[in-house]
């Protein structure tokens, strides 16, 4: 009985194991189909167990070698033609011209030398959602709020992708040659595709006169795309014909306040300055985000390229202004960037409100790590080093306000000043000179390092006009002091003053003595520099009086007369001579027998003294006799007396 039960139980267990095995085999296809990029090992086709998960082929490798060819040329209009957006597809029959640095010489292009670059793993911290609509929403919010949008750490990712190998000399030279190539089509050899509808193209619209150009390179598998941005190069930089549009973009993006507050030679492109070294930041940002600016044109150009190559790995490169725009575009979408002699772009990156990872100040984008941007340049280039803004610099004389000094990402600097003894000059900024004299000459690539300890526009103060701006109130206190007013009426004006009689009276009153001083001057013979008449001064000096119930002052006159023997330009240079007497005044009688050549008399003066008599009993003064001289003969229009007669007056 027990043995039969054991046999029955063993049979049930065997049936259950067989059923479980069949069930697992039946469910095996559904389990395999739920996994991506896996396959079953053929050697274990009869096995019910899953094989190892092996990725399928076709995924881009992080390292490799790429051979690039020119595929498209994009042109995005900005100022003259803001609606222009067209594409030229390069085909075997398309004939292109390479434009020289001065914009005058053109030659047919033959693509004999391949453009080869290698890739290496590169880690970039970027947004997880990089769709154009999402990025535009962040930028619009930054413009309305006046600062970058604060995002959570979950919205950022650390991606390791295939990036340009910046330690390989051949790869760096390839990117430099991409930025140096400036191609235009031979008329009639290519068909332009107008992205926003058919454009009424006019022959007067020059290829190099407006807009941002993008040269699109692709490798043989279309897995890696290189966009080389090239702005219209100013004549001061690359020798091409400069336009006003370049100064507008340069001074708007790379100046502290749109070319204001500095040299009068700078072209001012906005009116955002409020006072000395104080500006409205909201006003500047609004001007930078206009649709006819290079940054907005670069976003449109990039979005159209990614529509054509949605699954490709995109790299960016550029020179000078194009390099700065490439760097801003790379910071916006998290793309690898290689630039050459780029204008320092940390200042516009902070003002545009580009999203910044947590833990980094969005106002200091130069402090960000893992940006994937590498800026190659040398120390003799004032644009790259941020020193082309002095009073005597060529940039200033050309009207360019290049005040920014800080780069984002990594700086790879060739020290040509120390190694080669170069002088800092704007001629070393040209990309052709950089390729032939720097990149091809140096055997090793310089080390790259971030530029963290760098600050732009430290002397300036910026405020926002959305209601949070600071207000400064100053109070001025005015103190009014008494003002003394003197009124004079001149009846006989002269060359150096008034020739009227001047009378000054000073009266001092005391209980016993009263003093009165009277000076009277009457000019009968005016000269060029004053009166030439003898000076007579009468002074009245009070003497002690007999005091009764009412004090009565008694004065006795003293008369003095002086004659000038050595007249000067502005007065008499003789020592003063005065004869005084208590009861009578001496009188001086002079008759000029030897007049001077121009003026004055050279005779010696004779002084007569009257005898002393007793004082009068009455309290009044006795006048002294005076003498009057009459000129009988004069020369030089009556200015000089030659002969005179004297008459005594009582």
Swiss-Prot record:
Glycans are attached at residues 165, 200, 222, 280, 304, 466. It is an enzyme of class 3 (hydrolase). Residues 33-650 are lumenal. Binds to both phosphatidylinositol (PI) and phosphatidylinositol 3,5-bisphosphate (PIP2). One of its GO terms (biological process) is phosphatidylserine catabolic process. The chain crosses the membrane at residues 12-32. One of its GO terms (molecular function) is phospholipase activity. One of its GO terms (cellular component) is multivesicular body membrane. The keyword Glycoprotein applies. The active site is at 320 (charge relay system). Residues 1-11 are cytoplasmic. SUPFAM superfamilies: alpha/beta-Hydrolases (SSF53474). Its EC number is 3.1.1.3. This is Putative lipase atg15. Gene3D superfamilies: alpha/beta hydrolase. Keywords: Autophagy, Endosome, Glycoprotein, Hydrolase, Lipid degradation, Lipid metabolism, Membrane, Signal-anchor, Transmembrane, Transmembrane helix. Belongs to the AB hydrolase superfamily. Lipase family. Pfam families: Lipase_3. The lineage of its organism: Eukaryota, Fungi, Dikarya, Ascomycota, Pezizomycotina.
């Amino acid at each position: 009985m027990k043995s039969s039960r054991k046999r029955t139980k063993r049979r049930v267990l065997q049936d259950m194991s067989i059923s479980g095995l069949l069930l697992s085999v039946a469910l095996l296809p559904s389990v395999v189909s739920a996994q991506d990029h896996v396959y079953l090992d053929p050697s274990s086709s009869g096995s019910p167990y899953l094989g190892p998960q092996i990725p399928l082929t076709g995924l881009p490798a992080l390292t490799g070698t790429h051979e690039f060819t020119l595929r498209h040329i994009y042109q995005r209009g900005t100022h003259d033609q803001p609606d222009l957006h067209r594409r030229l597809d390069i085909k075997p029959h398309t004939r292109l011209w390479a434009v020289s640095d001065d914009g005058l010489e053109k030659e047919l292009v033959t693509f004999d030398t391949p453009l080869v670059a290698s890739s290496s793993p590169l880690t970039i911290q970027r947004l997880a959602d990089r769709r154009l609509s999402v990025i535009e929403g962040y930028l619009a919010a930054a413009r309305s709020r006046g600062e970058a949008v604060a995002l959570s750490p979950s919205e950022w990712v650390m991606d390791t992708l295939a990036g340009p190998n910046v330690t390989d000399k051949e790869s760096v030279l390839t990117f430099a040659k991409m930025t140096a190539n400036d191609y235009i089509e031979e008329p009639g050899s290519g068909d332009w595709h107008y992205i926003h509808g058919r454009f009424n193209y006019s022959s007067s619209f020059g290829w190099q006169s407006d807009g941002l150009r993008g040269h699109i390179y692709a490798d043989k598998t279309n897995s890696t795309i290189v966009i080389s941005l090239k702005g219209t190069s100013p004549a001061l930089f690359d020798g091409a014909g400069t336009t006003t549009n370049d100064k507008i973009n340069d001074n708007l993006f790379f100046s502290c306040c749109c070319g204001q507050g500095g040299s009068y030679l700078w072209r001012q492109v906005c009116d955002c300055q409020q006072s000395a070294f104080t500006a409205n930041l909201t006003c500047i940002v609004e001007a930078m985000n206009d649709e006819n600016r290079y940054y907005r044109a670069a976003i449109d150009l990039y979005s159209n390229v990614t529509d054509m190559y949605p699954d490709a790995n995109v790299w960016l490169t550029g020179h000078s202004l194009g390099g700065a725009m490439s760097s801003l575009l790379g910071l916006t979408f998290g793309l690898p960037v290689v630039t050459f002699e780029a204008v320092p772009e940390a200042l516009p990156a902070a003002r545009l409100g580009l999203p910044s990872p947590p833990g980094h100040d969005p106002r200091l984008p130069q402090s960000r790590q893992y940006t994937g941007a590498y800026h190659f340049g040398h120390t003799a280039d004032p644009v790259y080093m941020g020193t082309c803004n002095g009073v005597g610099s060529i940039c200033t004389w050309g009207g360019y306000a290049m005040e920014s000094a800080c780069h984002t990402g990594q700086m790879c600097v060739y020290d040509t000043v120390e190694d080669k003894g170069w002088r800092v000059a704007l001629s070393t900024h040209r990309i052709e000179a950089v390729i032939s004299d720097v990149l091809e000459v140096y055997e090793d690539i310089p080390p790259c390092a971030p530029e963290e300890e760098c600050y732009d526009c430290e002397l300036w103060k910026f405020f926002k006009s959305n209601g949070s701006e600071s207000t400064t109130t100053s109070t001025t206190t005015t103190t009014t002091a008494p003002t003394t007013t003197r009124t004079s009426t001149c009846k006989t004006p002269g060359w150096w003053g008034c020739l009227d009689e001047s009378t000054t009276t000073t009266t001092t009153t005391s209980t016993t003595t009263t003093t009165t001083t009277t000076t009277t001057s009457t000019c009968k013979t005016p000269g060029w520099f004053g009166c030439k008449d003898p000076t007579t001064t009468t002074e009245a000096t009070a003497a002690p009086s007999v005091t009764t119930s009412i004090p009565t002052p008694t004065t006795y006159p003293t008369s003095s007369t002086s004659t000038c023997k050595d007249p000067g330009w502005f007065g008499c240079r003789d020592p003063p001579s005065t004869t005084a007497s208590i009861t009578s005044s001496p009188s001086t009688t002079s008759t000029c027998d030897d007049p001077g050549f121009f003026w004055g008399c050279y005779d010696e003066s004779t002084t007569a003294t009257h005898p002393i008599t007793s004082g009068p009993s009455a309290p009044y003064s006795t006048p002294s006799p005076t003498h009057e001289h009459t000129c009988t003969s004069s020369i030089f229009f009556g200015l000089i007396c030659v002969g005179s007669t004297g008459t005594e007056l009582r």
